[in-house]
């Protein structure tokens, strides 16, 4: 029997894409993955996540990711984009005939639940799924590792903007400095984030 976990990384970031990942794992491998330390990616160091990423890839039947760009995030509802990405992942992993899909609950996930039921699988959509279910933890690690690598690439091009989150003073200062120098923001900034009204008002755009 196979289960699928789905989770995202970078949802609240001011800079860079959101990555949604899904992974298909045989049920009898979940205990092993839990025993070697697969858990919510936020509880792990980057080095540990990267080591576990390799093991997860080796022990899974397959995984897939969807990258949601800042431009998409600025033009559509973030929850709706997340649901679309989740459904896309579910359909890409349906070939493994999973019996259960474990997903971290974000907003009203009814549309995702309906798709899972339509495909004849059990929806397991709960708050903090990445904490309680190994398959969701594995997906959170995949999403985080891939996003970290994307962020590294962006930093090599645009400079060190810190974590990319609006709570990070380094990120805020980077945006302020870019704002002073460039009339047009680099495409890595999510222009609909309200913090821009304070630190870079001409960069800010309203979604609707």
Curated annotation (Swiss-Prot):
A divalent metal cation binds at residues 7-8, 104. Its EC number is 3.1.26.4. GO terms for molecular function: manganese ion binding; RNA binding; RNA-DNA hybrid ribonuclease activity. SUPFAM superfamilies: Ribonuclease H-like. GO terms for cellular component: cytoplasm; ribonuclease H2 complex. Coiled coil: none annotated. Keywords: Cytoplasm, Endonuclease, Hydrolase, Manganese, Metal-binding, Nuclease. GO terms for biological process: DNA replication, removal of RNA primer; mismatch repair. Manganese or magnesium. Binds 1 divalent metal ion per monomer in the absence of substrate. May bind a second metal ion after substrate binding. Residues 1-205 form the RNase H type-2 domain. Its cofactor is Mn(2+); Mg(2+). This is Ribonuclease HII. The lineage of its organism: Archaea, Thermoproteota, Thermoprotei, Sulfolobales, Sulfolobaceae.
